[in-house]
Design a protein with these regions (language model features):
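Helical element adjacent to the flavin cofactor pocket in flavoenzyme catalytic cores
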Residues: 5-44, 61-75
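Iron-sulfur (Fe-S) cluster-binding segments and ferredoxin-like electron-carrier domains
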Residues: 155, 286-297, 320-338
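Flavin-dependent oxidoreductases
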Residues: 41-43, 66-145, 149-160, 169, ...
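Dinucleotide-binding Rossmann-like beta1-alpha1 core, especially the glycine-rich loop
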Residues: 1, 5, 131-132
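Intrinsically disordered, low-complexity terminal tails and inter-domain linkers enriched
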Residues: 44-62
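Short Fe-S-cluster ligation motifs
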Residues: 307-323, 340-362
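C-terminal catalytic lobe of FAD-dependent flavoproteins
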Residues: 129, 138-139, 155-278, 285-298, ...
Length: 365
């Protein structure tokens, strides 16, 4: 038996990283349009639109993006749409690509199992990726997975008995006695697999102004900062970009009281009693942290938005206790009726109505 030790390897919270980057972008002027479905992308002529006739051919080419919330016009598009990247690429380019959703299922174990391994343990990579791994998380849980199953369904992020069984079997070959009785949830995600096994990054030859970031699967998260710089460099060459003297390069994170000393924590509660009102008992998340998550740049508007910013609902009971209390806070702070709140945006509403009203309606029938 032999292993390859990588002392510089590390782990990061993917939710926290993405939210931090997005909040920093928002502070620096980036606009976000959530729950907005792209329906069509068409090439257009900016010269015709603006009445200008002195532009080069590349400068004349632009895009009209029709969405569920209106029409947008853009001179450049960066296509970082994951499993849907092929759909948008193929709307504008004659050189078609295909992205296959590759499903990966996982087990997440309770923090009581978090020290079962101290490093990420990878199996030998194969045709479908790096295989089933066993890894600690930055918050002290144990993560086991993923599988690799190619699908036709670009929304197929469901778990299966076969997939979870595969995790049980393969993970035990690398790490013995994994306490799978401590599993608190299982989930699945989709990786954007390009049929040529390539990251497709760059401006399309036949569509100036359209920049692909397609087929970004493992190690996509690790590669993301470098990919971002690469794409920024492409845009810098094509646009007259100037450094913003008011750019804010740092972002203040959500206060984590668990990192404070007892004296500092007590002083925090004295100044703001909301930090002493525990909402999530599994993860010990206070009302103060939830309020911070709601009212910061690009603040949370859903139950999952709170969970991914604060970990309220990520513990052993998986929101069984705290979700009603979190929803009450969201409803109060956003001035939105409880019936309109969602789990993760879109149509994922959590409440259908008041039970007494439903029963009265049935009696009337």
């Amino acid at each position: 038996v032999a292993v390859l030790y990588a002392p510089t390897a590390g782990i990061v919270c993917p939710f926290g990283l993405n939210i931090a980057m997005a909040e920093n972008a928002a502070v620096n002027g980036v606009s976000f349009f959530f729950d907005t479905k792209v329906e069509t992308i068409e090439r257009m002529r900016l010269a015709e639109h603006s009445g200008t006739s002195e532009l080069s051919e590349n400068e004349k080419a632009g895009f009209q993006i029709k969405t569920s919330r209106g029409t947008f016009e853009a001179k450049y598009i960066v296509n970082a749409a994951g499993v849907y990247a092929d759909r948008f690429h193929n709307m504008v380019s004659e050189k078609k690509i295909k992205i296959t959703p590759r499903k990966g299922e996982y087990f997440l174990l309770d923090k009581s199992a978090g020290k079962h391994v101290s490093r990420t343990i990878f199996a030998l990579p194969g045709k479908y990726g790096k295989g089933v791994l066993v890894s600690p998380t930055v918050h002290g849980n144990l993560l086991v997975g993923p599988t690799a199953t190619d699908l036709d369904d670009k929304e197929g992020n469901y778990t299966t008995a076969d997939g979870l069984g595969e995790i049980r079997g393969k993970s035990g070959k690398c790490v013995k006695n994994i306490p799978l009785r401590s599993v608190i949830t299982s989930f699945a995600g989709l990786r954007a697999h390009e049929e040529g096994h390539e990251f497709l990054i760059g401006e399309l030859e036949d569509v100036p102004g359209f920049i692909d970031c397609a087929g970004i699967e493992s190690p996509g998260l690790t590669s993301a900062p470098a990919i971002g710089k690469m794409v920024a460099g492409i845009l810098k060459e094509k646009m007259d970009l100037k450094e913003d003297p008011n750019f804010q390069g740092t972002r203040k994170g959500i206060l984590d009281p668990s990192r404070l000393s007892l004296e500092e924590h007590n002083e925090l509660i004295r100044k703001n009693p909301a930090y002493g009102n525990m909402i999530c008992r599994c993860e010990m998340i206070s009302e103060g942290e939830i309020l911070d998550a709601i009212h910061r740049p690009l603040g949370a508007k859903s139950l999952d938005g709170i969970k991914r910013r604060t970990r309220a609902g990520m513990g052993r009971c998986q929101s069984g206790f705290c979700s009603p209390r979190t929803m009450e806070i969201l409803s109060r702070e956003l001035k939105v009726p409880m019936e309109e709140l969602t789990k993760s945006g879109g149509g994922s509403k959590l409440i259908t109505g008041h039970s007494k009203e439903i029963y009265q309606g049935e009696d009337a029938e």
